[in-house]
Amino acid sequence: MKTVPAMLVTPRSFREFFILLLGLWSILCKEPTKRIGEECRVQLKIKRNSSRSAWTGELFKIECPVTYCVHRPNVTWCKHNGTRCVPLEVGPQLHTSWVENDQASAFVLYFEPIHLSDDGVYTCSANLNSEVINSHSVVIHVTERTQNCSEHPLITASDIPDATNASRPSTMEERPGRTWLLYALLPLGTSLLLLACVCLLCFLRRIQGKEKKPSDLAGRERETNLVDIPVSSRTNSQILTSETGIYDNDPWSSRLGESESTISSQLEGNKQGIVYASLNHCVIGRTPRQASKIQEAPTEYASICVRS
């Protein structure tokens, strides 16, 4: 009797196959750092002959870049005192923290604030599996602050992620606000200047208009007087023409006698005066409308007699 191939797969063989599969999976998923130990050494990447400067009263910090594999090492800071490196005591003025990102990790030492006694040489050391690794030294030069040293910027709490008790504002953050305020005030100042110029021009024009009004009124009064004078003369000339029309029928001798008698009577009243006689002729007005209505009349001339 022949056996079926499906009957060869027994529970025992299936269990052995599953164990073999798990072993292969664990080998393939093992960390590459576990297989290659040389590429996974702890490194402290502080540059040789590093030096930093600070002023007393500043919030200061120094960093120790650390490269490690899986387990993070125990990192500490120490300060050199002669031939020894004394570990630093963490307190309110000195504290440490880890700063990690995608590219690298760093163990940071914070001075809040830094004092003149903090001047010296500092070293970062890492301890992993009883193996101690020391970094290069960092020299910190602390200078006492005076009134002339206020131009140096301060490291504030905005630069330190773990500082929570910092109360001083950042001077670098205030400068952009002042520049934007200056840019906003410039258009306002120019608009106020233009408004002042427009108001000044309107005021000058109003003064000139007030000065011109009296001169215009005087000129108009003179024109009206000049226009009114010919009208009165025309009315007198019309009256005279109507009166002189009576003497047209008289003979020349009677008119001479009457003129002599009138002249003699006037001279007796005023012996030292001068008698003027007006010419009786029509005066043509300035306006063409009034001149068209006046009828021309004959002109009479009178003699003037002067006696001393």
Curated annotation (Swiss-Prot):
Record-linked PROSITE patterns: IG_LIKE (PS50835)
Keyword Protein transport attached: no
Signal peptide span: 1-29
Principal location class: membrane
GO-annotated biological processes: adaptive immune response; cell surface receptor signaling pathway; immune response-regulating cell surface receptor signaling pathway; negative regulation of alpha-beta T cell proliferation; negative regulation of B cell proliferation; negative regulation of T cell proliferation
GO molecular function: signaling receptor activity
Keywords for the protein's UniProt record, in alphabetical order: Adaptive immunity, Cell membrane, Disulfide bond, Glycoprotein, Immunity, Immunoglobulin domain, Membrane, Phosphoprotein, Receptor, Signal, Transmembrane, Transmembrane helix
InterPro entries the UniProt entry points to: BTLA, Ig-like_dom, Ig-like_dom_sf, Ig-like_fold, Ig_sub
The protein's name: B- and T-lymphocyte attenuator
The species this protein was found in: Rattus norvegicus
